[in-house]
């Protein structure tokens, strides 16, 4: 795929909200803002766009690049990724159960956190498998297990 500025701008325009949401879901440090992370993801998308081979959907590929960039940044900085309440629609009222659930999701490990977040954003098992590099069966099993654990924690 030939990379040109127009193609890149159109791709970013189509997926900017998803990219922003992913960037916002990781707390890096006081030195890194969501905007900094967003720009880092854009650079990685630009660098990788020429190698995008269309075996996966564009949306899946962008999600994977953004997630991998954020995980790499998190490792470089030495902080754990943290899901913020803004990753999900804000409840119409302050609901402590909602925030408890967000904290429980935040406490999960990779790749389960990525699987849960991608599932919440409507990705199919096949798309999540491409994002994580796992098989569809592994995604299904890990999601089922993670959701079961979340239900158990929530009901305690």
What is each of the regions a protein language model found here?
Residues 51-53, 64-84:
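Arg/Lys-rich amphipathic alpha helix in sigma70-family domain 2
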Residues 41, 65, 115-116, 128-129, ...:
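Hydrophobic positions on the alpha-helical face of helix-turn-helix-like DNA-binding modules
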Residues 2-10, 20-40, 51-53, 131, ...:
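Short, charged helix-capping/linker segments at alpha-helix termini
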Residues 67, 71, 126, 132-156:
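DNA-recognition helix of helix-turn-helix
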Residues 36-43, 47, 56-68:
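Structural recognition of an alpha-helix C-terminal capping motif at a helix-to-coil junction
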Residues 107-131, 155-156:
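Short amphipathic alpha helix immediately N-terminal
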Residues 81-106:
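Acidic, proline/glycine-rich intrinsically disordered inter-domain spacer in sigma factors
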Residues 16, 20, 42, 113, ...:
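C-terminal flanking helix
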């Amino acid at each position: 795929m030939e990379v040109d500025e127009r193609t890149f701008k159109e791709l970013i325009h189509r997926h900017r909200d998803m990219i922003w949401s992913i960037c916002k879901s990781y707390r890096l440090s006081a030195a890194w803002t969501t905007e900094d992370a967003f720009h880092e993801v854009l650079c990685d998308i630009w660098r990788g766009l020429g190698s995008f081979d269309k075996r996966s959907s564009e949306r899946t590929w962008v999600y994977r690049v953004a997630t991998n960039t954020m995980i790499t940044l998190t490792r470089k900085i030495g902080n754990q990724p943290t899901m913020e309440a803004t990753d999900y629609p804000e409840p119409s009222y302050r609901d402590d159960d909602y925030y408890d659930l967000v904290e429980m999701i935040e406490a999960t490990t990779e790749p389960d956190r990525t699987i849960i977040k991608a599932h919440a954003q409507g990705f199919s098992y096949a798309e999540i498998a491409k994002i994580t590099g796992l098989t569809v069966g592994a995604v299904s099993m890990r999601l089922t297990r993670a959701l079961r654990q979340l239900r158990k924690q929530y009901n305690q």
